[in-house]
Every structure is written in structure tokens, then in C-alpha cells.
Amino acid sequence: MGLKWSKESQVVRLLSYNVEWGFLNLPPDIHGDSCGHPIPNTDIAQQTHLKLIAKNIGFAKPDICFLQEMGSLDAVKYIAAQLDDMFGLVYSCYYSNGEDKGNQGVGLLVENSLLPYSKVINIPNFKLNRALGLTLSMGSIEYKIVGVHLKSLYDRKIKKDEAEQESQIQAVLDWVGDPEKAILCGDFNNIPTSDPIKKVTDASYTGIIDSDKYVPNIIANTYTEFHGKNGKESGSKIDYIFKTDDVELVSSHIIDIQREASKQDPTLRGETSDHLPVLGIFKLN
């Protein structure tokens, strides 16, 4: 049996992970990943990809796990089944696009022993439904936890895209209400000095990677996303977990797993993701 959450300990492990095309059935126009590896459009390639994603999640043993770039509820359930098989971790599954398939959405895994204290909803007015909210009731105290995937800047229409990002952030802030007992996480698709991220920090949220509870990796940077081809990769920090001041942080981590296969197998995908998972460990008291 895997570890179960205990209300007595009040410690919650929260993971945010962009899994890069976490689909059981890829859209027909997707043939490669962000770092230039081809993506075979086969069942075995996608299933192996999701199994490796589940393996990475299982090592972190999160109580709550938000997943970006998921393609369906079935794909979220596939990851959950692998976590049960490999680690004995049992989760309930949620997906921001409901039963719809074929578009990127946000998946959510909630460890089953948390269910009596939890309620999951879609964030109102969040464009493309790429956000889920979790209300966690601890006695008389209510925590709000949100996982998002903000608009990409891939099309390089920066002004337009950042305006949409700020609109999405506002939808989250509106749902949370007063900045108390709240945690925001996900792929925000922008760097720490950008206006959208400043909108979050100006609303009384602090990034946990910027805190004194952050445990650095040996590589000595805080990159969470990587791009570029033919060995010319570069990194940036666009995945975050933010918290209000009244949420106690035990520690925070960027999980520095190996993302790319040392020897490429043409029948499988060349990397698990162009992102690294971000883990926050909190004491909810």
C-alpha cells in the first residue's frame, strides 16, 4: 500500500507538472516535441510516455498533483492506474475539459484519503478551461488551491498573449477572493520579471522557489522549462507554485529528473517532457 495522507500530520505534498502532450491519442498534426525529437503517433509511444510520467510523479508521492497538457480524462486515469500499479498510490481523477478529448487541458490527481475534505471545480471565466480549483476544508479553515496552464507565447504575439494571461490570472484571483489560505500553481508560460507574474505577486502571493525553504539542485539554476534543438537547448523558469503569507511552507523543490533519453529509440518518444515538476510541501494548520 502507498502512503496515505493523514489529517493529523496536516502536511500536504503538492506537485505541478507539465507533461508535454499527455495524450493517449495525439492530434494528427503533432509530430515532434519542443526539443526537436520526433513523436511517433502510436499507442505504445503514448502509453510508454504516460507510464514514465507516472513514474516521475510516484517518486514525489504527492497528495495533490496538477498536470498540464493533458488530452483527456482517460489519459489522467491512465496515469492514475500506473501510479496504483507501480507505487500503490490511489488517486481520484479530474479534468478541466470534462469528457471532451483532443485539446490540452489540466488534469488533477487527489489522493483518496483527502476526498472527504475536498471539492473540485472549474475556475469560472478562465479561457479554454485550463484551470481547476480545489477547496480543502480543514475543520473551520478553508484552503483554496488552483492549478493553471496560462496562454502560451509560442505565436510571439506577446502583447496580445500577455493580456490574455492577465485575464486568466484575474479569473483565478476572483475565484479565490481575499488572498488568504491560498496556493496557485502551474505552467504560467512567462518569466518572473513579466507583467503577468508581477500581477500575481502584487496580489500578495509569493513564489515558493524564491523562499528560504527552497532546496536547490546541484545544477544551481531554477529553470523549469527547456527548448531548442540539435543540442542547443536553453532554459527558463515558467512553472510556479505561489502561496499567501498565511500558508506554512515546509520545503520547495524543482525535481531535477533526466528528461531526455540518452539513446533515442525511434519507436518511442525522446523526452518525458520539456518541463520539470515543481513540488511544494506545506503544513496546513
Model-identified regions with their sequence ranges:
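Active-site environment of divalent metal-dependent phosphoester hydrolases
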Residues: 72-74, 100-103, 153-155, 189-195, ...
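Active-site His/acidic residue clusters
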Residues: 147-160
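Metal-dependent phosphoester-hydrolase catalytic domains
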Residues: 1-5, 176-182, 189-285
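Structured beta-strand-rich core segments of catalytic domains in phosphoester-bond hydrolases
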Residues: 64, 68-150
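Active-site beta-strand/loop signature of hydrolases that rely on acidic residues for catalysis
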Residues: 14-19, 52-77, 134, 145, ...
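Short, solvent-exposed loop/turn and secondary-structure capping segments
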Residues: 25-28, 77-80, 119-121, 157, ...
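N-terminal, active-site-proximal structural segment of metallo-dependent hydrolase catalytic domains
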Residues: 1-82
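Soluble non-cytosolic domains of exported or imported proteins
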Residues: 40-51, 69-73, 125, 159-167, ...
